[in-house]
Amino acid sequence: MNYIVIVAGGKGERMGNEVPKQFLLIGEKPILMHTIERFHEYDKTLKIILVLPEEQQNLWKELCSKYSFTIEHQIVNGGTTRFESSLNGLSQIPEGNDGLVGIHDGVRPFVSVNTIKRCYDEAQLTCAAIPVMPLTESLRIVEKNGNSKSVERANYYNVQTPQVFNIMMAKMAFAQPYQESFTDDATVMEQFGCKISLVEGNQENIKITTPLDLKLAEILINEKQPKD
């Protein structure tokens, strides 16, 4: 059996808004509902685990009632770090399950179904897969002495979610002590010794964290389904 852990722990501070960013409206309903719908569209048998701060859970339930949102999902308390939140989600998966689990940012509602499929298909073959997109702007690295130099853009990618892993390997990897070098879930797996496979993401799969992102999201939601 396959799972998706959707981590939604934002507080909306960078938005300058008291409403948690995952609850902000685009297309007349909360961002988080669009995100969950995308995975349900990919696979209606996928088990959905929503990781949400405890103090936000009553509001979420009220929103589900208000917007008649009925896609089945399990709610789990968020942690103080992304690592802890992902771990809390993984802990709800029964032991001995040899399926796949994706971990996804709750504020990425425009991930395409084909991107999701590519991640799960590749992880089935290789144990760990993440979606990436090539960079389009030039890069420079700043050295300790303050000097900078250009770096080869082709060697770098923007990393997206969902990041999909073998469940048993993910549970073992997240049993490691937390390290500050864990910038995302894939780095936890990498530290454990898993090779990370890269698959093509989709350009619209933005993480909505700033007012500008929200404006872009409002444009995207009024267009047709995300391109692959």
Predicted segments — roles?
Residues Y157-D228:
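Conserved alpha/beta core of the MobA/IspD/sugar-nucleotide pyrophosphorylase nucleotidyltransferase superfamily
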Residues Q57-W60, F83-S86, I116, V132, ...:
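A general structural signal for well-ordered alpha-helical segments in protein cores
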Residues I6, F23, L32, G89, ...:
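Residue-level signal for inorganic ion chemistry
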Residues M33-D98, P177:
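Conserved N-terminal catalytic core of the sugar/cofactor nucleotidyltransferase
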Residues L46-I48, L100, A128, K195:
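Residues at the starts of beta-strands that form the adenosine-phosphate
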Residues M1-N58:
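N-terminal glycine-rich phosphate-binding loop and ensuing alpha1 helix
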Residues T80-V142, G146, Q160:
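Conserved beta-loop-beta/alpha segment of the NTase-like Rossmann-fold superfamily
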Residues K149-V159:
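A recurrent flexible, glycine/aromatic-enriched loop bordering the glycosyltransferase active site
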